[in-house]
UniProtKB/Swiss-Prot annotation:
InterPro entries: CTAG/Pcc1 (IPR015419)
Listed name of the protein: EKC/KEOPS complex subunit Lage3
Main location: cytoplasm
Keyword line: Cytoplasm, Nucleus, tRNA processing
Membrane-crossing segments per the record: none
Cysteines engaged in disulfide bonds, as pairs: none
GO cellular component terms, A-Z: cytoplasm; EKC/KEOPS complex; nucleus
Source organism of this protein record: Mus musculus (Mouse)
Lineage, uppermost ranks: Eukaryota, Metazoa, Chordata, Craniata, Vertebrata
Record's function text: Component of the EKC/KEOPS complex that is required for the formation of a threonylcarbamoyl group on adenosine at position 37 (t(6)A37) in tRNAs that read codons beginning with adenine. The complex is probably involved in the transfer of the threonylcarbamoyl moiety of threonylcarbamoyl-AMP (TC-AMP) to the N6 group of A37. LAGE3 functions as a dimerization module for the complex.
Pfam families in the record: Pcc1 (PF09341)
Region of interest (Disordered), residue spans: 1-21
Example GO biological process: tRNA processing
Length: 148
């Protein structure tokens, strides 16, 4: 597998930021997508140990939500599915405070986070990138998938 270019986005809730996304097959080519085009599908609930009320993150008034999107292109959709399947079982250590969603669209692995605490968001992203690196190296080690 070749080195993948990734598009990153970080916007505050309600911001009209844009997401930069790499186009598969065109190294260095990026498409700009409005950040609101891909909302986080699930509302996140506060941790039971939190001093805040049990209102989902997306419904708390006056709370700033940090969002981060990562788009990782793969040479084939099968490799993207393999990577997604390998990364989905990893449980988020701060489940009630950080939400993570993985999805495959064609050859692109899409990962989205939402959190109130930017430090927990950063920790989750760093852990994910470590795991992603391991998965990509493993795919490279075993070579491209064989079609039956």
């Amino acid at each position: 597998m070749q080195t993948a270019h990734t598009g990153l986005s970080h916007t505050a809730d309600g911001a009209d930021g844009q997401t930069s996304r790499c186009c598969p097959g065109n190294a260095g080519t990026k498409a700009v997508i409005p950040s609101g085009a891909h909302p986080v599908a699930r509302a996140l609930e506060a941790s039971r140990n939190s001093s805040k009320s049990m209102v989902p993150l997306t419904q708390r008034p006056g709370t700033r939500h940090h969002r981060f999107s990562l788009f990782v292109p793969f040479p084939t959709s099968l490799e993207a599915e393999i990577a997604c399947g390998s990364l989905v079982p990893d449980v988020e250590p701060h489940r009630g405070l950080v939400g993570k969603e993985l999805k495959v669209s064609g050859c692109m692995l899409e990962v989205r986070w939402i959190a109130e605490d930017s430090r927990l968001l950063r920790l989750s992203i760093i852990n994910f990138l470590d795991q992603l690196s391991l998965v990509v190296n493993t795919i490279q080690l075993f070579g491209p998938p064989v079609s039956c």
